[in-house]
Amino acid sequence: MNADFLGLLLLYLAILLCAAPLLGRHIRQAMNGERTWLTAWGQPLERGLYRLAGVDPAAEMDWRRYAVAMLVFNVLGVLAVYALQRLQGWLPLNPAGLPGVAPDSALNTAISFVTNTNWQGYAGESTMSYLTQMLALTVQNFVSAATGIAVLIALVRGLARHSAATLGNFWADLVRATLYVLLPLSFILALALVSQGVVQNLDPYVEAQTVQAQQYETARLDAQGQPMTGPAGQPLTDTVVTRVQNLPMGPVASQEAIKLLGTNGGGFFNANSAHPYENPNAWSNLLEMLAILLIPAALCWTFGEMVGSRRQGVAILAAMTVLFAGFSASAAYFEQQPTPALRQAEAALLADGGNLEGKEARFGVAATALFATVTTAASCGAVNGMHDSFSALGGVTPLLQMQLGEVIYGGVGSGLYGMLAFAILAVFIAGLMIGRTPEYLGKKIEALDMQMVALVILATPALVLAGTAVAVLADAGRAGVLNPGAHGFSEILYAMSSAANNNGSAFAGLSANTPFYNVLLGLAMWFGRYTIIVAILALAGSLAAKPRLPASVGGMPTTGPLFVALLVGAVLLVGALTYVPALALGPVAEHLQP
């Protein structure tokens, strides 16, 4: 780890941790229905939306009604996004004349964006019309993030309330998170990105003549538009030579802003934030990294204020920051190591360079390694370089951060409710060690609570490992692997980890836009999202019904360094050890290969 990366990391954390309390306080006020600086324009619109939908925001829901409302809303979202993709060839705002998306790809994409995963098996500039990008994908970027915030706030209410039967109103939480948090921040960030050169228009694509002929390989497609494979299962490609380049246009900045702030991650273009029209320079890169973790960090402060003790939120934030700093340093160190070719040339370890494969020259190793850590610490999935080109151990950092459950800051809302599940596990373990009934924030942790916590922690590993096994055993699964051996296994493991944990980034060597992977990854995304959410809401309902107990002398404090250390240990030991055998077969084996 060199001085460039250390300076960038310290600057990043300083800005992030200074902004978190300010935004966290605003989120608490907005979600509680208190007056904020946005009330003057937001409240009339909020009331109008309630009247239009026939919703009484004061009518509270128990956890079951809250869960049903959330699930119905998200199922309707899948149907709407699917329909828009299938019909886009007949709809307006399609200057490139793009046809409707294939059924399996459309279903995968619909589930992906509704679940806040934003896994993309397609290239946006050659698949999605402007209308689909705006009305289907961008809208889901907002409401999927708002759903995560709403579920978190319901859990926090469960911890803050006592002897209560309700958790709030899902529709009110959804509207407030969108109107008062996501929309204003996205508007500000979109303007900032436009000022740096990010594209924002509805113009048709521009055809440019290149000075030199370009030659590249493209996947050979069948009559249904699916990639073809040879007798041995290898992908078939065609060589294309051209002197014409299409420069894609579109409403990029408006989608880019919420893609980052909502920890969605789906790029307008295939190259995502490595594309100069999405992320032109170092300033836009810093803004995008800050946007990814801004709301997850701020929600820790919101949590502390809502439960009546800011130190509770600070302790959770401290644990997240310790884990994040460690993983960031690891990624930077391994990516700064010279590749085998550079090592043979006796390149210095601390010299500029390192593993530059798959990295944009305008960002370099340090900014790419930090971006990779940021985007997989959150359930974002946006990338400014190719994770598949990371070194074997450098690629472990983004992979393992996802496998921990996306709790190191994590997604908007989802990261903190996942970390709170680990916090309850930590106090449960501590209670067992000292022979006392475990308590968290004055609530006794009982059998039902631990069953829900266990479901939250173990659901995604089960999906990841089972899905990886199915893909490795199936002919259709192995056919999508471009690189054989340990790295090919890592590509499958990464795809399943990304889908089940709702991240969306990929080791791009896997040809995943096939019926097999579209269905398999779609199932992983759906159950990885909603199994955990329903378990969290059941946990919230159980905690809300409990009386609050006074602090006892022998109780474990949950605001000090000891608790932070115990929480970090619980995340690493319980989360990471689950995947040790799989990691040994993939990136570790690849690293040990001569």
Curated annotation (Swiss-Prot):
Q: How does it sit in the membrane?
A: Multi-pass membrane protein
Query: Is Nucleus set as a keyword in this record?
Result: no
Entry's family note: Belongs to the KdpA family.
Species this chain originates from = Bordetella bronchiseptica (strain ATCC BAA-588 / NCTC 13252 / RB50) (Alcaligenes bronchisepticus)
- Kindly list the GO molecular function terms attached to this UniProt entry: P-type potassium transmembrane transporter activity; potassium ion binding
- Identify the GO cellular component terms for this protein: plasma membrane
Highest taxon of the source?
A: Bacteria
Q: How does it assemble?
A: The system is composed of three essential subunits: KdpA, KdpB and KdpC.
Transmembrane regions: 3-23, 67-87, 136-156, 179-199, 287-307, 314-334, 415-435, 453-473, 519-539, 562-582
Q: Which gene encodes it?
A: kdpA
HAMAP family membership = KdpA
Family annotation (InterPro entries): KdpA
Keywords, in A-Z order: Cell inner membrane, Cell membrane, Ion transport, Membrane, Potassium, Potassium transport, Transmembrane, Transmembrane helix, Transport
User: By its UniProt entry, which PANTHER family does this protein fall under?
Assistant: POTASSIUM-TRANSPORTING ATPASE A CHAIN, POTASSIUM-TRANSPORTING ATPASE POTASSIUM-BINDING SUBUNIT
Record has Ion transport as a keyword: yes
Instruction: Explain the purpose of this protein.
Output: Part of the high-affinity ATP-driven potassium transport (or Kdp) system, which catalyzes the hydrolysis of ATP coupled with the electrogenic transport of potassium into the cytoplasm. This subunit binds the periplasmic potassium ions and delivers the ions to the membrane domain of KdpB through an intramembrane tunnel.
* Name recorded for this polypeptide: Potassium-transporting ATPase potassium-binding subunit
Compartments (UniProt record): Cell inner membrane
NCBIfam families the UniProt entry points to: kdpA
